[in-house]
């Protein structure tokens, strides 16, 4: 198996393990992902991780190999809303534990921290992320701000904090990123 295949298999194996203890990774453990659906927990995690920059309908069609009974965008949104943020934190943590980090000169971790802003789906009713129309945007836009910890030698993300665009506070985000949480 090539290294990329090992990485992908490892990722899918972690998601498979997670699917056996859903209560830690969903918002309502008593009812979320209990019934059999086309977009079960494993497929949702696989789909979200493998999505590219296409429209949601295109991504769903690709994921389900252009099957005529592909789930709708609405079904995707409903299932996605059941996932807890802890599912992705756990996946990142477990994945990083499977591949030890490289140390610079055998004893140091070189870690960078940087922020980025991302536009998200427009929703003028969300005051925490919506930015009013201005000279650059005629209809306004919604945005989130992320702060990431990145280990330079291993070329891996260790931790991430997401904040609503209008409430961004890089200093607070940096303080909430914990090297310990990243398992360095």
Where are these regions (language model features)?
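Conserved, well-structured functional cores that handle cations and Mg-NTP chemistry
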Residues: 1-181
């Amino acid at each position: 198996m090539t290294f990329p295949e090992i990485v992908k298999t490892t990722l899918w194996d972690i998601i498979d393990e997670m699917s056996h203890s859903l209560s830690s990774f969903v918002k309502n453990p008593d009812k979320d992902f209990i019934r059999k659906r086309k977009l079960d927990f494993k497929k949702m995690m696989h789909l979200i991780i493998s999505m590219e920059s296409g429209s949601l309908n295109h991504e769903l069609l690709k994921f389900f190999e252009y099957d005529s009974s592909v789930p709708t965008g609405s079904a995707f949104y409903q299932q996605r809303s059941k996932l807890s943020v802890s599912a992705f934190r756990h996946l990142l943590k477990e994945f990083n534990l499977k591949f030890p980090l490289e140390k610079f000169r055998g004893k140091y971790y070189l870690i960078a921290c940087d922020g980025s802003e991302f536009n998200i789906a427009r929703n003028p009713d969300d005051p925490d992320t919506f930015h009013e129309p201005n000279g650059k945007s005629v209809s306004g836009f919604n945005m989130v701000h992320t702060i990431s910890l990145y280990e330079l030698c291993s070329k891996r993300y260790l931790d991430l904090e997401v904040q609503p665009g209008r409430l961004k506070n890089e200093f607070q985000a940096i303080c909430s990123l914990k090297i310990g949480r990243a398992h360095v």
